[in-house]
Amino acid sequence: MHLGAGTASQLGQWLGLPRNSLRTLVACGAAAGISASFNTPMAGVIFAMEVILMEYTIVGFIPVIVASVLGAVISQLVFGSDISFDVDTRIGVEVAVIPYMLVAGLIFGIAAVAFTRLHMLFFRLHRYSLLLRFTVIGVVTGLIAVFVPEIMGTGYDTLADALNGVLTLEILLLVVLAKLAVTALATGLGMFGGLIGPSLVIGGCLGGALVLIGGDLMPVAIDPKFSVLLGMVAMMGAVLNAPMAALVATLELSHSPEMIFPSMLTVVVACLTLKQRFGSEGVFTEQLRHQGHDILSDHGKGFLSRVGVDSVEIDSLASLHEASNRLRSPEAEALVVVPVIKSEAKPVLGVITKTNILNYYGM
C-alpha cells in the first residue's frame, strides 16, 4: 500500500498535477498496492475511497477501480492466482456466540489502541537521524526475533498455523506482543513496510488466543478459524480506521458470506472502543494530526477547490441602507444572505441569513 501510494505521489508531483488530482492518483496507487498484495481488489477500492479520498464520487471511483483491477491482474500474471493465505471458513454462526463476539471486539479495540499509541510514541522520535533510527530498528528486531522468530517476514505462515489451530496459547500471545511491539517500532521510526499485513497477523493470533482462553466458557463450540478471522478483520479495521475496507476484505479472504454479520459486529465494537473510549482515530489520522494536518479541514478545502466560483456566485444583489427598514423591500425578499458593510468603501463585515432574521422575529 505504502509503496503504491508513495510511487503515485512522486509521479504526480513530477507531472505537476493539482492537489485534487494528486490525491486521486495516490488513492489509485494505494488501491493497486492492496489489490496486488492480498488479491483483494474490492477491499483496495473501498480502502482508497474510505481513508484517502474520504468520499464516494464517480470522478474518483472509476480511476481507483481501474487501478485496483490492474494491480490484481498484473500480480496474478507475475505470481499466479494463488493467494498468500487461504481463509476458507464456511461455517455457520449461532446466536449464542454473540457475547463472545462483543467481548472479543472490545479486546481487539484495546489492542488497536495499544498499537496506535505505541506507534505514535516512536513516531515522535523522528528528530533523531535516519541512520540511528534504522539501527535501533534492526538491533531490537533482531534481538526479539532470536526468541520469537515468528515475527520475521510477512507472518502468513504463522497466521495459517493459527487458522488451523496448531499453535499453543503461549506462542500466540508471544507473537501478538512481539509483532505489535516490533511493527509499532519500525513504522513509528519511519521504516514503513506496511500496516495491513502486520495488523492481520496480530489480530489473527490474538483471536486464536482468545478462543483458547474463553472458548470453553461458551455454550457452543467455537471454530478457531472463526475467532482468528474476527481478529484479523477487527484489528485491520480499527488500526487503519477503515471498517468498511476490513469488512470487504473479510468477504474476499474467507469466501464466506456467513462471516459478514459477526465481522460487522466485532469491527463496530473494536472501532467504537478505539474512538469513543480512548479518543483515537487510527494510525494514519493520528500521524497526520501530529504533523499539524487537519485531515477533515483539508478534505473540505479539497472539495471547495473543485468548485468553480461561477457555480456559486450570487447574481441577485440589493443595496440596503444602514438603519433603514428596507429588509422588507421586494429586493430583499429574494435574498437568502444579506451582506453587512460599514460603507461602500469598506469590505464586507459579515452576513445575515434569512434564517437569522426569521428566528430573531420569532417567525
Where are the model-predicted features located?
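The conserved cystathionine-beta-synthase
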Residues: I314-K342, G350, T355-M363
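Alpha-helical transmembrane segments and immediately membrane-proximal extracytoplasmic
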Residues: M1-D315, G350
